[in-house]
Amino acid sequence: MYALYVFGDIIATILGTIPFLIIYLGSLVTGSLYTLYYHKKEPYYSAVGASGAVSGIIYSSILLFPDMQLLLFFAIPIPGYVFGVGYLLYSIYGMKKQLGNIGHAAHLGGAIGGFVLTLALKPELFFINKMMVLLLAVPIVLVLLFSDKLKSL
């Protein structure tokens, strides 16, 4: 919830309360839908939580401020866009390896929702920083293209 507090404040301040709620709830839905899709052949799979929504908020904040400095392991400063791409790549790896009791598919689906909804609410981002938008889109596009193959790798 700390991540929601920190990153949510960025979105609420820049875009406003209603856009924040749209991104949060939309990411919650996309995270849930992607999880259902990814685990469609696992009838006993269950998950609970709002991690997809929080992931959408994080990815939205990074899209708004890709050069923000984040601390990796509370000590190593890295740019937001590096964290964003790394976060999604780790989620893909976690989905493949089924790491821990974590909803990696929800994280990925929520990030996709946060990315798409932020661009829908603030389309000028694409024109202001086209290369960064494309860089942040790469892991999303890869997942959407190869999602069915992810489990069989």
Task: Describe the predicted segments one by one.
Residues 1-153:
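A detector for small-residue-rich transmembrane helices and their helix-helix packing motifs
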